[in-house]
């Protein structure tokens, strides 16, 4: 057993102090764009991501106004103007002056009504029993909702859908937050809205906004690949749209105030992105450097240097999976080995920046310094830098907040280092993951203020997938709205003598509470067939003991899962509540699938698991 002490309050505070940051220009290795989009979603990815009572997220609209419009309505210095200009640069296309002016006029009107609504809500907060204050708030809410419906059309103008996509995603984000706010206000103000109608509208708009963003992201990516074989341009589009569009829509699921009626520890954004390559861009447009694998935490590096000129010739990454007692995993070799090597394991802190020194003559790396959040520097080199004129210095990081906040609260941490090409001076790539994704799978029941809290764990943070018979479990690329990779279970009917086909998704947990706690568990998934108690099903075990059944339902037809929509995924709860022991790392959650081959259908049976959520019993 791991004797590491689990301090509940300390764990709950992990990644919880996320303030809205002022908009700054930031650099993605040569790509300059605004960080305001990320500032908008930061309050929604910490421990206190979703607050179930008036206050907190109910006030998120007012809190976001100075982020989106830092200089007020009269200035073009606003989020929407910035993201439109950024997208023009990425796509190397211009939005017509007419479309821009039309959108900005609409935005000015939207800002005025947003501020108009904010003032009314501020007044109501101080006069909650005043019927006139309530009536005024209702009226202004209704006007703002109508204004959003009318305004969304201006962010999807024909022939400009891709160029306007980040602006559309941010407007959709604000509209859904407003609709969510209305549902929450209805809990404390009688008949504030027509609840059933309003909730259906919330769900419809959410689905519509996700579909639009997913469709036009794909079309934009296809379009840019048809125009160029330049990896830099393609990577810039992918990184920028992931950060400014897909990350936003991936959080829309959590805006539902009925499903998320408690504070929630979100770990949605497991999707990784690349900063610009160092040295030459990869030669092959169709390389796929993002592996569809289980999540791993970078723990160290082994670097190899040439015997004579001491330039970097190769390296290996070292990882640990989410089981903290497991051995360090040795990654693939990039380049080639020598007898000159440096091997170092990082501490439990995360790497937020890499400083690289490149020989100006050999055009090869001679020194790597990895910087972590505990002020440590990990130097991988076999030479001292004495004549700075002989070398070029590059600082590689992916941070979308103020440059002054890079170390204090980086938006992304290093996930993996890559190399492409046959020579040591070919392309080096650095892969990054969002800072909300913790290395382990902590399970909470309450936050530091003793409020119940929902814990979300992506299926991709399993430590192991195991198969029995003809069933296959594997990590695959998730749809645009899930936030990252997902787990696919597939099995086909084959004539053999196997008595059973099966598979297990193994998820290690660290429980962070002082007494045994019971949880309801729900799973977000898609499936092309139904659970059947007699010969098809899924169950949950804890340390090999059966604790609950997962009765999944068919959500889509056919065997093609490559283009599933948001409406093809759903939550279902396990039948039983599950008790977990307190303060231990000796808990393994196993989601097991089983099929009797004699009763399989003729088509491939598919279940796709995105995330598992744990809701403590009050």
From Swiss-Prot:
It is found in: Secreted. GO terms for biological process: sporulation resulting in formation of a cellular spore; symbiont-mediated killing of host cell. GO terms for molecular function: signaling receptor binding; toxin activity. Pfam families: Endotoxin_C, Endotoxin_M, Endotoxin_N. GO terms for cellular component: extracellular region. InterPro entries: Galactose-bd-like_sf, Pest_crys, Pest_crys_dom-III, Pest_crys_dom_I, Pest_crys_N_sf, Pest_cryst_cen_dom_sf, Pest_cryst_dom_II. The keyword Ubl conjugation does not apply. Its main location: secreted. Keywords: Secreted, Sporulation, Toxin, Virulence. CDD domains: delta_endotoxin_C. Not significantly toxic to mosquito larvae. May increase the toxicity of the Pesticidal crystal-like protein cry16Aa (Cbm71). Belongs to the delta endotoxin family. This is Pesticidal crystal-like protein Cry17Aa. It comes from Paraclostridium bifermentans.
């Amino acid at each position: 057993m791991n004797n590491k002490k689990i301090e509940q309050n300390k764990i709950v505070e992990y990644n919880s102090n996320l303030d809205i940051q002022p908009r700054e220009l930031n650099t993605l290795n040569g790509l300059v764009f605004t960080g305001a989009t990320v500032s908008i979603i930061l309050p929604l990815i910490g421990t206190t991501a979703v607050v179930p009572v008036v206050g907190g997220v109910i006030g998120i609209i007012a809190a976001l106004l100075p982020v989106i419009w830092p200089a007020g309505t009269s200035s073009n210095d606003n989020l929407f103007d910035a993201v439109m200009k950024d997208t023009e640069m990425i796509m190397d296309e211009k939005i017509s002056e007419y479309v821009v002016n039309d959108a900005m006029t609409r935005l000015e009107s939207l800002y005025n009504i947003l501020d108009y609504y904010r003032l009314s809500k501020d007044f109501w907060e101080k006069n909650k029993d005043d019927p006139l204050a309530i009536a005024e708030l209702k009226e202004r809410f209704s006007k703002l909702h109508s204004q959003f419906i009318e305004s969304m059309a201006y962010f999807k103008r024909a022939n400009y859908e891709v160029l306007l996509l980040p602006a559309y995603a941010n407007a959709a984000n604000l509209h859904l937050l407003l609709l969510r706010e209305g549902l929450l206000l209805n809990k404390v103000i009688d008949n504030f809205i027509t609840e059933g109608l309003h909730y259906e509208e919330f769900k419809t708009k959410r689905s519509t906004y996700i579909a639009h963003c997913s469709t036009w992201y794909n079309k934009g990516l296809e379009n840019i690949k048809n125009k160029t074989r330049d990896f830099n341009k393609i990577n810039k589009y992918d990184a920028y749209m992931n950060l400014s569009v897909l990350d936003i829509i991936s959080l829309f699921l959590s805006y539902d105030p009925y499903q998320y009626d408690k504070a929630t520890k979100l770990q949605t954004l497991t999707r990784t992105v690349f900063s610009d390559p160092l040295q030459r861009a990869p030669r092959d447009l169709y390389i796929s450097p993002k592996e569809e694998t289980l999540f791993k935490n970078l723990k160290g590096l082994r670097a190899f240097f040439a015997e004579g000129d001491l330039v970097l010739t190769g390296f290996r990454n070292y990882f640990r999976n989410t089981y903290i007692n497991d051995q360090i995993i040795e990654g693939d070799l990039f380049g080639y080995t020598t007898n000159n090597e440096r091997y170092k394991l990082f501490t439990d802190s995360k790497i937020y920046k890499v400083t690289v020194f490149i020989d100006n003559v050999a055009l090869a790396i001679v020194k790597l310094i990895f910087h972590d959040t505990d002020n440590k520097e990990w130097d991988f080199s076999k030479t001292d830098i004495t004549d700075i004129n002989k070398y070029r210095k590059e600082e590689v990081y992916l941070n979308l907040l103020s440059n002054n906040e890079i170390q204090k609260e980086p938006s992304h941490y290093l996930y993996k280092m890559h190399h492409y090409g046959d020579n040591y001076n070919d392309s080096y790539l650095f892969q990054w993951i969002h800072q909300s994704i913790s290395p382990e799978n902590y399970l909470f029941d309450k936050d530091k203020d003793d409020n119940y809290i929902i814990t979300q764990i992506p299926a991709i943070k399993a430590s192991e997938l195991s198969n029995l018979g003809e069933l296959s479990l594997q990590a695959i690329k998730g749809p645009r709205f899930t936030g990252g990779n997902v787990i696919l279970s597939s099995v086909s009917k084959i004539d053999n003598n196997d008595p059973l086909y099966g598979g297990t998704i193994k998820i290690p947990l660290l429980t962070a509470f002082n007494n045994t706690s019971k949880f309801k568990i729900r799973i977000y998934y898609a499936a092309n067939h139904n659970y059947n108690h007699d010969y098809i099903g899924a169950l949950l075990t804890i340390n090999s003991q059966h604790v609950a059944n997962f009765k999944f339902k068919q959500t889509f037809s056919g065997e093609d899962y490559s283009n599933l929509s948001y409406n093809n995924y759903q939550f279902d709860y396990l039948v039983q509540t599950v008790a977990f022991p307190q303060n231990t790392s000796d808990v393994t959650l196993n989601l097991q699938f089983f099929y009797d081959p004699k009763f399989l259908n003729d088509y491939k049976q598919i279940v796709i698991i995105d995330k598992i959520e744990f809701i403590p019993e009050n």
